[in-house]
Design a protein with these regions (language model features):
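Active-site/ligand-binding neighborhood in enzyme catalytic cores
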Residues: 103-107, 113-255
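A short, basic/flexible loop-to-alpha-helix module at the beginning of a structural domain
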Residues: 1-14
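Short catalytic/ligand-binding loop motif for oxyanion handling, primarily in non-cytosolic enzymes
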Residues: 52-54, 102-103, 107-110, 117, ...
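Mid-domain catalytic core of redox enzymes
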Residues: 37, 237-353
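N-terminal Rossmann-like FAD-binding beta1-loop-alpha1 element of flavoenzymes
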Residues: 16-44
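Glycine-rich FAD pyrophosphate-binding loop
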Residues: 35-61
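Dinucleotide-binding Rossmann-like beta1-alpha1 core, especially the glycine-rich loop
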Residues: 62-135
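C-terminal catalytic lobe of FAD-dependent flavoproteins
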Residues: 333-393
Length: 393
């Protein structure tokens, strides 16, 4: 692998069998698989000055390994994903835990047996927990919106408490919408856990942190003689879609294109922009992440050395996250797609414009306008690369 800032003089896209736009999970996975499986020469074009996408991490002045774009916690149920990523990193045994600061009391999130006892006291908390067990069984995740629909006064009491103190205000801060306006695929990610396990991902068999960090993982993944990486390159300056064809520097490009950027930006927002939420980061607590679910302006604080396992006496780095609406072409980072029927229809209109381009493959959270965990986007890229490989094997 060679990483270059900008495109060299005389760059010829036709020297490459595949162009990948974006050096995050989706792009890096596809680049690696096509290079090593069918011998594709691959050019990876990355708009930012670094690889690894939003998983990028670096050592700050205090020596703390910081996730620049907010905390990324690896977890998966998918054995194929885990085996693939494990080729490029060893893992530390990190089990992520999150606390919610509810009016000064720190409670485990997802809301669980321990949270019930803290919120309602020992006696009432146990009564409510038995009702949850009788209704749903132990070690079950129950989405908060499903719990609210139960016609039972005890379950309604739990639902109302969690909704008001853990879910409602945090959700409005993060998304700028009320829960009933938010797509169920998002609200379903906020469950009540009927059990005592206070890990954030209690049932995921594979979880941890890359031993040397995420950036090192990506460096290893992209380390291949047939892969060239060009940072500080905006693919929109050379790549266009016209009449069912991919043009690069105005000429038809016959190789494969894996595109992981926003589709609306590829077309200069000519049908309108797809809304996102973005985060401002403002760079001492018992766990890696504390969610502030009630009154504070920020959504959460992360203390990174609690996640990386670094021992740095007297030194720490925290990050506060403030969520607000994303402004396209402003230099902000689009984090969370605001998925609702209107936005979905707009995305489908953009997607239709590339659907007939057989060598153009949109993949990833931006290109698919989805809320993606790291393991899910990795799996999506593995499946896409399977399809491309099958056409060239």
């Amino acid at each position: 692998m060679q990483i270059t800032s900008g495109l060299p003089t005389g760059f010829n896209p036709h020297d490459y069998d595949m162009i990948v736009v974006g050096a995050g999970y989706a792009g890096a996975v596809c680049a690696r698989r096509l290079a090593e499986t069918v011998g594709f020469r691959v050019a990876v074009l990355e708009r930012r000055d670094h690889i690894a996408g939003n998983a990028y991490d670096y050592y700050d002045e205090a020596g703390v390994l910081v996730h620049l774009y907010g905390p990324h916690i690896y977890h998966t149920f998918n054995e194929r994903v885990h085996e693939f990523l494990s080729r490029f990193t060893e893992w530390t045994d990190y089990q992520h835990k999150v606390l919610a600061n509810v009016h000064g009391t720190l409670m485990p999130v997802p809301f669980n047996h321990k949270s019930l006892l803290l919120a309602f006291g020992e006696e009432r908390g146990e009564e409510l927990y038995r009702k949850l067990v009788d209704t749903f069984g132990e070690n079950k995740k129950v989405p908060i919106m499903e719990l609210r629909e139960k016609n039972d006064p005890d379950l309604q009491e739990v639902a109302d408490y969690v909704y008001e103190n853990v879910f409602l205000h945090y959700t409005m801060k993060q998304w700028g919408q009320t829960p009933d306006q938010i797509d169920p695929s998002v609200t379903g990610r906020v469950p009540v856990f009927v059990g005592d396990d206070d890990r954030y991902f209690p049932q995921a068999p594979y979880q941890g942190m890359p031993k040397d960090g995420y950036t090192a993982l990506f460096e290893n993944m992209l380390e291949h003689d047939l892969i060239d990486v060009f940072c500080n390159v905006d693919a929109r300056d050379l790549l266009t879609i016209d009449d069912g064809r991919v043009l690069v520097n105005g000429e038809v490009y016959g190789g494969e294109v894996v595109y992981t950027g926003p589709l609306d930006e590829l077309f200069n927002l000519d049908m309108g922009d797809l809304p996102y939420r973005t985060l401002d980061m403002d760079q001492f607590q018992p766990v890696g992440t504390v969610n502030y679910t009630v009154s504070e302006d920020f959504t959460r604080i992360t203390e990174f050395k609690n996640m990386t396992g670094q021992v740095l006496p007297g030194k720490t780095t925290i990050m506060k996250e403030f969520s607000h609406a994303y402004v396209p072409n402003s230099g902000q980072t689009p984090y969370y797609a605001i998925i609702d029927p209107d936005n979905r229809k707009l995305y489908e209109r953009y997607l239709e414009r590339v659907s007939s381009v057989t060598n153009f493959h949109p993949v990833g959270r931006l290109a698919e306008y989805r809320y993606y965990d790291m393991d899910a986007v990795t799996y999506s890229a593995l499946e896409l690369s399977d399809e491309i490989i099958s056409c060239h094997a």
